[in-house]
UniProtKB/Swiss-Prot annotation:
Keywords: Chaperone, Disulfide bond, Membrane, Metal-binding, Mitochondrion, Mitochondrion inner membrane, Protein transport, Translocation, Transport, Zinc. Residues 1-13 have a biased composition (Low complexity). The gene is TIM13. This is Mitochondrial import inner membrane translocase subunit TIM13. One of its GO terms (biological process) is protein insertion into mitochondrial inner membrane.
Length: 99
């Protein structure tokens, strides 16, 4: 009988842990999507302002080239900042438990 009651007592805790993990993953995914949307909006805003000085019905080849280069540089800078941030957070988490 103890195994019957024992399995019932552990189940709600496991359900709660699973729900917390699922919620955490869902929030992380939503944040990643929001960050990607923000990055795309910033790229569009900044690169368009820089490269398209005289809007017309189509882009010139120089405007297309400028937009492509601007986007590439913006993405590379964002990637570098993201890697540095993740490394710093990982380092801080590694140091925090030892305090």
């Amino acid at each position: 009988m103890s195994s019957f009651f024992g399995s019932g007592a552990g189940s709600p805790s496991n359900d709660m842990t699973a729900r917390k993990e699922q919620m955490k993953q869902s929030i992380q995914q939503e944040l990643a999507i929001a960050n990607a949307q923000q990055l795309i909006n910033k790229i569009n805003e900044n690169c368009f302002a820089k490269c398209v000085t005289k809007p017309s019905t189509s882009l010139s080849s120089s405007q297309e080239s400028c937009l492509s280069q601007c986007m590439t540089l913006y993405m590379a800078a964002f990637d570098q900042v993201s890697r540095s941030y993740v490394a710093r957070i990982s380092k801080e988490r590694g140091v925090a438990p030892g305090l």
